[in-house]
Design a protein with these regions (language model features):
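Polyanion-binding surface elements
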Residues: 2-29, 58
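Major-groove DNA-recognition helix of helix-turn-helix-type DNA-binding domains
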Residues: 20-44
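A short macromolecule-binding patch
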Residues: 47
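A short, Lys/Arg-enriched interface patch at domain edges and termini
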Residues: 50-64
């Protein structure tokens, strides 16, 4: 099944930080390092909710 762009949920850096229980700066570092994909819209970043899920899944796999 192909997911349409209109269904994707995008979060701000602050929302991602709150979800991951880290600082905004940590989220910016993850984006800059290429560990967390993000789209730049104007001067701010947006992160797809699916990309956060994939990031967490990868981290749990590495830890286990």
């Amino acid at each position: 099944m192909v997911r349409q762009h209109s269904q994707a949920r995008f979060l701000t850096v602050a929302e991602v930080a709150d979800l991951l229980r880290v600082s905004n700066m940590t989220v910016y570092r993850l984006i800059k390092a290429g560990e967390l994909p993000a789209a730049r819209i104007g001067k701010s970043f947006r992160v797809r909710e699916d990309d956060i899920d994939a990031y967490l899944e990868e981290r749990f796999t590495q830890a286990g």
